[in-house]
Amino acid sequence: CRWQGYHLHILGYGFTPTPELAALAHRSRELLLQMSVDLIEKMAPEYPQLDPAEYRDYRYDALQGGWAGLHYLWEKGVTRSLSDGMPLYARYGLDYTAYPFPRAEEIIAAIQRAEGVPVLAHPHNYFGKLELAALFGIYNELCAAGLGGIETYYPTHSKTFAAQTALFCEKKGLLITSGSDDHGLFAHTGGWEQYRIGSLMMEPHRLR
């Protein structure tokens, strides 16, 4: 979802499925799928082995993780691995900021109406370069919008970042969660080995 120039991932914990949430999920998924359609169309003039019409009917083994666009580029020899395809979206001007994903406030409110807790996923991915005061300022703004928790423990989070975020959550009474972001087999190769369920280092006593 979109928030002040950032593209955030917000999780819903303990919610009751509702038509509103289903509609938001469907809308977001359609935009994600369209990103790959647009990428193949943009790359096709440079790579004759790519066929936009063929791609629209393309199917892949979901057990391998990733998504159709990554698999198609890999099978066609454009990339050497599934993860090699990920930077291409931004390179061709087709990253998340180019699409009208829902606003963070809209997602947070919908999760709350579904009696769930909105949790910010992997904050270091967006805010890792900020000074502590600026980071806590953003956390406070999101809390004012209704955020109820933060994914504190994550593969890219340093011990310092995780401890700082956990401290903020404890002071605010927010959920403290942990996640590996395991997306299947494609994330278990190259430099992605740490993205495995159960491999994450954390402080269990702080989870809440």
Labelled PLM ranges:
Residues 44, 105-115, 119, 166-170:
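Surface-exposed amphipathic alpha-helices with a cationic face
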Residues 131-140, 167:
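Charged helix-capping and loop-helix junction motifs
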Residues 112, 140-143:
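Non-catalytic positions within long, well-ordered alpha-helices that form the structural scaffold/packing
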Residues 1-65, 145, 150-199:
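A metal-dependent hydrolase metal-coordination microenvironment
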